[in-house]
Curated annotation (Swiss-Prot):
One of its GO terms (molecular function) is damaged DNA binding. Its main location: nucleus. Residues 235-484 form the Ku domain. The gene is ku80. GO terms for biological process: DNA recombination; double-strand break repair via nonhomologous end joining; telomere maintenance. The lineage of its organism: Eukaryota, Fungi, Dikarya, Ascomycota, Pezizomycotina. It is found in: Nucleus; Chromosome, Telomere. This is ATP-dependent DNA helicase II subunit 2. Transmembrane segments: none annotated. Its EC number is 3.6.4.12. Residues 281-299 have a biased composition (Polar residues).
Length: 725
């Protein structure tokens, strides 16, 4: 079970916090809230009911706290009691966090109030307690009863963090470790800084700058994972049921590496006609007419699956079948072979949970590409000294003999067995076996590719000098280029050393980018999502110094390899390009006496539309072709029996869109789709055809925007608005 946590954030919302300083676009309060929001949203993302938060506003216009009758506690408001934060609490707090019109309020009194909140909520139970104070160090601070405050913080084991903001001429608080020192500091503010620093030092807390804290929020937080054993059993050599000399060691198995997957999106529908918390009826599909703007009024979409079989005598030619009436069948060629549940149980392999050693192999003879799974560790059963000694002996034996063990693993009874490799791992204070799954014979894919250093002719002759083989100059140039791109660093003595890929500093861009986007949208539902943090993209490009160092080697490699730039693909209007000439060099059109097309036939609309555009000599011809296609599409919609012609309309409209993008006439298509949408929604084409409009939206056949054609006058926002209606 996760530890219980209670954190109280004290945020300075005084009048001075509404100012912008040091060239920042954000106010001091907005800048401070970047850190607070990051902490809060990370806690909310865990979904833990035992992770609770509280927020206190310092220097507020009014007073709202249980100690407000005393003068020292004026202009301090409890914005949120200690509780589990949800989406609604985030939105409510965002509306209340605003700069006030006063700079009155005692930070020390706010600290006392936070301690009181934690004592009241946590009592004497086992909790992780933390208080975070963010202030610019201005205003009056009461230095009385500091000994009592320090004593209470230590007694209740409360972690205290105090962060400063930026002042008028630079950082308010000095931080020698972070390279910050303010010159000509106001004596009153210097006194406040000394007071706050003294409190944190006596409480064994942290006193730092907000700039450092905000920068550290860019570093993704790796979620701690509580270890859960995937196997508890025996590592055994020999059959203990038949032989007394068999070896059995109680062991446990835990994951060492596991892919961390980003959160997945769930489907919801925006329902304004339902009360909060009320669910809609069960349905197989749900198509919302509008996109939800925030997290409110969302209803779960539940799918209903039905099974049907053909029956000519039934209405509609099909009848429903219950899931319990279904039988399993295995594909055999082009037919299905039925196997009943009774027979299927017989075919299953009966196994018992165990890890049985089947052999050993020299480490140098094992190929690393045989790894087939995540990595696990095998340790002795906890609190079993005899098992620890036995496993340690086995690990050291493998290490000294430079060998690996091969074992047959069954994690649970009657589960399919797997082959695993066991490798010794010995650290100064830790020993274990590293385990990876090995492939069976059917899992190995063996392919043979042509050799890279010689060519075998049809007659069987081996050729080492060939146009498809690199010569010595090319190999030398490539070697020097690769060497120049080698990652290197320096040790404590300044000597060059190879630096491996820093796993501890390489975070999953997809995982943390999705999490950051979710948190950003939760706080600011209408603002654009900020760009990804630099630490997530640092490995998307080689280091600058390596590129500069390898530049001359790359130029020589290009010269030796005779690399030539491929001419860019021709752009522009199709009619402006030269037509492709046949290999015969004959003019096929003149030989066939093909006349220019005037009318487009509804029975062969798409090919004839393309021919008309290819033969068009002016814009009027193209306009006429688009007009004819619009008429044909509207006739297909008007005379469609149900959705019989919807696919034809979608295909035809898609061809018109692609062709007009290629001919750089996006305006013609945009006029067409606007008129078609109006006719569909106003039911001018034979009744309610909204389902067709939904199909066109799903096929992304909306307006041509500027990203798709430079000549388009439609922006991305206009295109989205057009499709959302």
């Amino acid at each position: 079970m996760a530890d219980k946590e209670a954190t109280v954030y004290i945020v300075d919302v005084g009048k001075s916090m509404g100012e912008r300083r040091n060239g920042r676009d954000l106010t001091d309060l907005e800048w401070a809230m970047k850190y607070v929001w990051d902490c809060i949203t990370n806690t909310v993302a865990t979904g833990r009911k035992t992770a609770m938060l509280g927020v206190i506003g310092l220097k507020t216009d009014g007073t709202d706290n249980e100690l407000g009758d005393e003068s020292h506690f004026s202009h301090i408001s409890v914005l949120s009691e200690i509780k589990q934060f949800l989406m609604s609490d985030i939105r409510e707090l965002g509306e209340r966090i605003k700069p006030s019109s006063v700079d009155k309020g005692d930070a020390i009194s706010a600290l006392i109030l936070a301690i009181q909140m934690i004592i009241t909520h946590c009592k004497k139970l086992k909790w992780k307690r933390k208080i975070v104070l963010i202030t610019n160090g201005l205003g009056r601070m009461n230095s009385e009863n500091l000994d009592d405050i320090v004593s209470k913080v230590k007694e209740d084991n409360i972690e205290l963090i105090i962060l400063d903001l930026t002042g008028r001429r630079g950082p308010d608080f000095d931080d020698a470790e972070y390279g910050i020192k303010e010159e000509d500091k106001d004596p009153h503010k210097a006194s406040n800084e000394t007071l706050l620093r003294t409190i944190t030092e006596r409480c064994d807390g942290v006193f730092g700058t907000l700039e450092q804290a905000v920068e550290e929020t860019e570093i993704p937080r790796v979620k701690p994972v509580r270890p859960v054993a995937s196997f508890k059993g025996f590592l055994q050599l020999g059959n203990p049921e038949e032989y007394d000399t068999a070896v059995r060691i109680p062991v446990e198995r835990y994951p060492r590496t596991m892919v961390a997957k980003p959160p997945t999106a769930s489907q919801f529908v925006l329902r304004s006609d339902l009360a909060a918390g009320q669910e809609g009826p069960v349905s197989s599909t749900a198509v919302p007419e509008t996109q939800p703007e925030d997290g409110s009024n969302l209803t779960n979409v539940r799918n209903l699956r039905t099974y049907q079989v053909s029956d000519e005598s039934a209405p509609g030619g099909k009848i429903d079948v219950e899931r319990d009436d279904l039988a399993k069948g295995y594909e055999y060629g082009r037919t299905a072979v039925h196997i009943s549940e009774t027979d299927e149980n017989i075919t299953r392999l009966e196994t018992t949970a165990a890890m049985e050693l089947v052999g050993f192999i020299q480490s140098e003879r094992y190929d690393r590409y045989m790894h087939l799974s995540n990595t696990h560790i095998i340790i002795a059963n906890r609190a079993n000294d005899k098992a620890s000694l036995a496993l340690s002996s086995f690990i050291h034996a493998l290490f000294e003999l430079e060998s690996y063990a091969v074992a047959r693993l069954v994690t649970k009874e009657n589960k399919p067995p797997t082959l695993v490799l066991l490798a010794p791992s010995i650290e100064p204070d830790y020993e274990c076996l590293l385990e990876v799954q090995l492939p069976f014979a059917e899992d190995v894919r063996t392919y043979r590719f042509p050799p890279l250093d010689h060519v075998v002719t049809v007659s069987g002759k081996v050729v080492t000098q060939h146009r498809n083989l690199p010569n010595d100059d090319l190999l030398d140039a490539m070697d020097k280029y690769v060497d120049s791109m080698e990652l290197k660093g320096t040790d404590e003595d300044g000597d060059l050393v190879n630096t491996p890929f820093p796993i501890d500093d390489s975070f999953s861009p997809v995982l943390h980018r999705v999490n950051a986007a979710i948190r950003s949208r939760a706080i600011h539902p209408n603002d654009p999502i900020p760009p990804p943090a630099r630490i997530l993209t640092q490995f998307s490009q080689p280091p600058e110094h390596l590129l500069k160092n390898a530049e001359r080697h790359l130029k020589r490699l290009i010269e030796v390899a005779d690399v030539k730039k491929v001419p860019p693909k021709a752009k522009g209007r199709k009619r402006a390009r030269e037509p492709e000439k046949p290999l015969s060099g004959l003019d096929v059109d003149s030989l066939l006496h093909q006349e220019k097309r005037v009318r487009i036939s509804p029975n062969n609309a798409i090919p004839e539309f393309k021919q008309t555009l290819a033969q068009a000599e002016n814009i009027e011809t193209m306009k006429d072709a688009v007009k004819q296609m619009r008429s044909i599409l509207e006739d297909q919609i008007r005379h469609s029996l149900g959705d019989a012609n919807y696919d034809r309309v979608t295909e035809g409209l898609g061809v018109v869109r692609e062709e007009l993008i290629a001919y750089e006439e996006p305006g013609l298509y945009n006029d067409l789709i606007r008129k078609l949408k109006e006719a569909l929604l106003k039911e001018k084409l034979g009744g309610d055809q909204r389902e067709l409009w939904w199909l066109l939206k799903r096929s992304k056949l909306g307006l041509i925007e500027q990203r798709e054609s430079e000549l388009s006058e439609v922006t991305e926002e206009e295109a989205k608005k057009f499709m959302s209606a």
